[in-house]
UniProtKB/Swiss-Prot annotation:
This protein binds to the 23S rRNA, and is important in its secondary structure. It is located near the subunit interface in the base of the L7/L12 stalk, and near the tRNA binding site of the peptidyltransferase center. The keyword Transmembrane helix does not apply. It comes from Shewanella denitrificans (strain OS217 / ATCC BAA-1090 / DSM 15013). NCBIfam families: L6_bact. Belongs to the universal ribosomal protein uL6 family. PANTHER family: 60S/50S RIBOSOMAL PROTEIN L6/L9, LARGE RIBOSOMAL SUBUNIT PROTEIN UL6M. One of its GO terms (biological process) is cytoplasmic translation. GO terms for molecular function: rRNA binding; structural constituent of ribosome. This is Large ribosomal subunit protein uL6. InterPro entries: Ribosomal_uL6-like, Ribosomal_uL6-like_a/b-dom_sf, Ribosomal_uL6_a/b-dom, Ribosomal_uL6_bac-type, Ribosomal_uL6_CS.
């Protein structure tokens, strides 16, 4: 049984949460997010808290309630503080630069890569080998970061590639004669 769903989500000052049937909207200083909550979960908003209760007699309702609680908590954190994901480019000649809403990447291919940034994600390059993605939607930030990393994942022999800032690449030893 999920214990995550038992903890309510606290609504901080400056954040407004509204429920319309099964659609939950969270508005804050950084923006607003909307999500449809599973029908196996009852949502109750009271005393600056959002509580999630499973519907009786539905299989997996506790799990759905825990998932809904985690998603709504991420929405509340996103609209109040925002999320940031950092990427590092490791390799000779690996570069990144921003051109409008596009991210131009030079990753050792014969051609430059252009990654279009979706609405809701902003990128900045403090240096040519660093990318900082920020926004209110945690899932979208992670998805964009994974797509960029997927162009050239870090390889285990030299460690070259695009990696998350906190990622530790396990290195392998080269084959010996």
């Amino acid at each position: 049984m999920s214990r995550v769903a038992k903890a309510p989500v606290t609504i901080p000052a400056g954040v407004e949460v509204t429920l319309n049937e099964q659609t939950l909207t969270v508005k804050g200083s950084k923006g607003s997010l909307t999500r449809v909550i599973n029908s196996a979960v009852n949502v109750v908003i009271e005393d600056a808290q959002v509580k999630f209760l499973p519907v009786e007699g539905v299989d997996g309702a506790w799990a759905q309630a825990g998932t809904a609680r985690a998603l709504v908590n991420n929405m509340v954190v996103g609209v109040s503080q925002g999320f940031v994901k950092k990427l590092k480019l490791v390799g000779v000649g690996y570069r990144a630069k921003i051109a409008g809403s596009d991210l131009d990447l030079t990753l050792g291919f014969s051609h430059p890569l252009v990654h279009k940034l979706p609405a809701g994600v902003t990128a900045e390059c403090p240096s040519q080998t660093e990318i900082v993605l920020s926004g209110v939607d945690k899932q979208l930030i992670g998805q964009v970061a994974a797509e960029i990393r997927g162009y050239r994942p870090p390889e285990p022999y030299k460690g070259k590639g695009v990696r998350y800032d906190d990622e530790v690449v396990r290195r392998k030893e080269a084959k010996k004669k």
